[in-house]
């Protein structure tokens, strides 16, 4: 089991999702998530954490995303401490994801 998470680019995150079925956890606030979020992202909040634990395999890769890639680091480290084996944080967060032209779902 890894003792820390790894920071990766938005494109590396997309490759993990496409090639290894990684779960992307978006930790931004509900309003922003509802407005737009990466395609198929799980909205991880204090309230949804139990469902997250039920749905996500501890051995599968988990990628955490926030607004700019800062607060996701704390959540990524928390998930490592909870026993997840492969945890990543997206450099640049959702802003970087969107600028990279990767798939997003929007309310508009």
From Swiss-Prot:
EC number(s) from the headed UniProt entry: 2.8.1.1
Entries under InterPro entries matching the protein: GlpE_sulfurtransferase, Rhodanese-like_dom, Rhodanese-like_dom_sf, Thiosulf_sulfurTrfase
SUPFAM superfamilies assigned to the protein according to its UniProt record, in alphabetical order: Rhodanese/Cell cycle control phosphatase (SSF52821)
GO molecular function annotations of the record: thiosulfate-cyanide sulfurtransferase activity
Active site residues per record: 66 (cysteine persulfide intermediate)
Keyword Ligase tagged: no
Location of this chain's protein in the cell: Cytoplasm
Pfam families cross-referenced by the UniProt entry: Rhodanese (PF00581)
A Gene Ontology BP annotation from the UniProt entry: glycerol metabolic process
GO cellular component labels: cytoplasm
Keyword Cytoplasm attributed: yes
Gene3D superfamilies recorded: Rhodanese-like domain (3.40.250.10)
Keywords recorded for this protein, A-Z: Cytoplasm, Transferase
Domain Rhodanese stretches: 18-106
Reactions catalysed, as given in the entry: thiosulfate + hydrogen cyanide = thiocyanate + sulfite + 2 H(+); thiosulfate + [thioredoxin]-dithiol = [thioredoxin]-disulfide + hydrogen sulfide + sulfite + 2 H(+)
Main location: cytoplasm
Function recorded in the entry: Transferase that catalyzes the transfer of sulfur from thiosulfate to thiophilic acceptors such as cyanide or dithiols. May function in a CysM-independent thiosulfate assimilation pathway by catalyzing the conversion of thiosulfate to sulfite, which can then be used for L-cysteine biosynthesis.
Protein family according to the UniProt entry: Belongs to the GlpE family.
Protein name: Thiosulfate sulfurtransferase GlpE
Organism (species): Actinobacillus pleuropneumoniae serotype 5b (strain L20)
Gene, per the UniProt record: glpE
């Amino acid at each position: 089991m890894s003792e820390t998470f790894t920071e990766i680019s938005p494109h590396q995150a997309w490759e993990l999702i496409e090639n290894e079925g990684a779960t992307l956890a978006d930790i931004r606030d509900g309003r922003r998530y509802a407005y737009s979020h990466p395609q198929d992202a799980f909205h991880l909040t204090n309230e949804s954490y139990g469902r997250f634990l039920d749905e996500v395999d501890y051995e599968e890769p988990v990628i955490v995303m926030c607004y700019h890639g800062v607060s996701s680091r704390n959540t990524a480290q928390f998930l490592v401490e909870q026993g997840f084996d492969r945890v990543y944080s997206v450099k640049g967060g959702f802003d970087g994801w969107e600028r990279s032209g990767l798939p997003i779902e929007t309310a508009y």
